[in-house]
Amino acid sequence: MEIPSKQIDYRDVFIEFLTTFKGNNNQNKYIERINELVAYRKKSLIIEFSDVLSFNENLAYEIINNTKIILPILEGALYDHILQLDPTYQRDIEKVHVRIVGIPRVIELRKIRSTDIGKLITIDGILVKVTPVKERIYKATYKHIHPDCMQEFEWPEDEEMPEVLEMPTICPKCGKPGQFRLIPEKTKLIDWQKAVIQERPEEVPSGQLPRQLEIILEDDLVDSARPGDRVKVTGILDIKQDSPVKRGSRAVFDIYMKVSSIEVSQKVLDEVIISEEDEKKIKDLAKDPWIRDRIISSIAPSIYGHWELKEALALALFGGVPKVLEDTRIRGDIHILIIGDPGTAKSQMLQFISRVAPRAVYTTGKGSTAAGLTAAVVREKGTGEYYLEAGALVLADGGIAVIDEIDKMRDEDRVAIHEAMEQQTVSIAKAGIVAKLNARAAVIAAGNPKFGRYISERPVSDNINLPPTILSRFDLIFILKDQPGEQDRELANYILDVHSGKSTKNIIDIDTLRKYIAYARKYVTPKITSEAKNLITDFFVEMRKKSSETPDSPILITPRQLEALIRISEAYAKMALKAEVTREDAERAINIMRLFLESVGVDMESGKIDIDTIMTGKPKSAREKMMKIIEIIDSLAVSSECAKVKDILKEAQQVGIEKSNIEKLLTDMRKSGIIYEAKPECYKKV
């Protein structure tokens, strides 16, 4: 039964709760917390709602239904109790907070209604915008400018100053009206910060925009979370109007939340709920010796073929193991790039990945700016306040960032993902806001060939509109070519079977697969065995040895690919929920790395593997030809002001360089700023 709060002295009930409530270990739970609060001069006492409910149902009812009235009463009682324990506490801390956690009333952002206003509720979401910290007056000190008074007083007398600054009309000391002057040095201030919380991407209904809610953080809650953090906020819903309320004002108000407590999710993928039954099913699946192949078969099962690519996408979904060292952090996420002819189902596969991944953000290159991908400082039109706003890579922190048509991005926007892909952070310094946000996400991107279809005779850097600085950051690159052949009948039959509703056998349903991936990412951190370590080391050393056989040998592999091998090996182990990376995992990782190097990292002229095709965009053979042409330009420019094109062509052909290659290299060098056209058809080295 409801009991109005005025019939009970909740101060006494609350103090009795704090001093007598015992936890599971039969210890005075809150006495210990209060002692710690006093000793370390903290400002907040965390109270579990379930404890209050088991102690006094009436107090629990008032806390969640009459929060605006009851919370200041409880905070006042707590402060008085602390001063009895330690009177010196007042010298350091003027205000103490009661933070209630574990509220049963958890509401989805899009289901907030007017009936929730004034009540204590909990909301899950992502923090997308944060303002710099400001100061709010919660107790102003005024001076009455009147010859008969001139006294100072605090205002408001019995409560806190609301969001809009109030001035007294009559002096509480002398009872007369007059002029009142604010005394800033005696006014009490509190740290204040505005933020915006948004629905999590996986909760937004298809075809709808994510809902947002403005939240207010005060005192020790400011800067407790950063844009991109997944948070659980508990607070009181209230209403406000942008402009002062006056006659003729619109009778429509915005809802905002004054936060009582905020919990930043430290757990990986805690939005995926895995029951005991799910866990048993996952462990049973992992016992299947062919589980990896079953998982790969379950990736975009409606798309025919592309086994190696699906294998790589599965590896990216599981990821490796990130390592945090004293001076750096080594990423565990696996980045994948798909370059494919039109109609090879690139976008379909990316869409599937965004659905099956426990946490994913899908975006397209054409519709993405640098700010939209990483972070931005945004100015609000109404108030002129600056917000730090998180972009797609920050929102995908801990999951997968899916970027379709990455080749369509503008160069100035594409540069923004360099740091996010390797360091997995996003740094921003604009409008006085300097921040570094986490972007610990695997990037899976797709793009179309520059010339419409992939030209096998050209290196990968010539086939896609991406600079080598980005290409080199992808662990694996796959090329999908639409080539007519013997498999066309099988392809046609497969597509017709899909359209006729025939299901593919032996695949794992999408919901189970999502939970399996979440479980592996959350709980499985395999260690590399000495056998696997030796196999990876031998492969790396053997490839490097081939690079040093002759002075003309290209570089076959770099330490960047070695790190990728380790990540891929760990991902194979995670797919089977294994605690160790075995020889089999290392062998599979080496096979897929070798496939990548032999299909993408090949110098088309020599036919040899040359990792510089990806790392720098120019294989060793092209670099050597470029150096010869530079020497020719230097020697020709000695006798005259610059080297004429016809003379360069003549001398370069004499040393065995084809005319078409010479013209292409001259164009590339001019674009790169190595040479410039001093006169028409006459070049000089910069």
UniProtKB/Swiss-Prot annotation:
Keywords: ATP-binding, DNA replication, DNA-binding, Helicase, Hydrolase, Nucleotide-binding. Changing A420R: Predominantly monomeric and loss of helicase activity. It comes from the Archaea. InterPro entries: AAA+_ATPase (IPR003593), MCM (IPR031327), MCM_C (IPR048908), MCM_dom (IPR001208), MCM_lid (IPR041562), MCM_N (IPR027925), MCM_OB (IPR033762), NA-bd_OB-fold (IPR012340). Inhibited by the cdc6-2 protein. The ATPase activity is not stimulated in the presence of DNA molecules. Pfam families: MCM (PF00493), MCM_C (PF21100), MCM_lid (PF17855), MCM_N (PF14551), MCM_OB (PF17207). ATP binds at G340, D341, P342, G343, T344, A345, K346, S347. Signal peptide: none annotated. Changing K346A: Sharp decrease in ATPase activity. Almost devoid of helicase activity. SMART domains: AAA, MCM. Changing K346A: Loss of helicase and ATPase activity. GO terms for biological process: DNA replication. A motif (Arginine finger) lies at residues 472-475. The keyword ATP-binding applies. Presumptive replicative helicase. Has ATPase and DNA helicase activities. The latter preferentially melts 5'-tailed oligonucleotides and is stimulated by the SSB protein (single-stranded DNA binding protein). The active ATPase sites in the MCM ring are formed through the interaction surfaces of two neighboring subunits such that a critical structure of a conserved arginine finger motif is provided in trans relative to the ATP-binding site of the Walker A box of the adjacent subunit. Homohexamers. Forms a complex with SSB. This is Minichromosome maintenance protein MCM. It comes from Saccharolobus solfataricus (strain ATCC 35092 / DSM 1617 / JCM 11322 / P2) (Sulfolobus solfataricus). The lineage of its organism: Archaea, Thermoproteota, Thermoprotei, Sulfolobales, Sulfolobaceae.
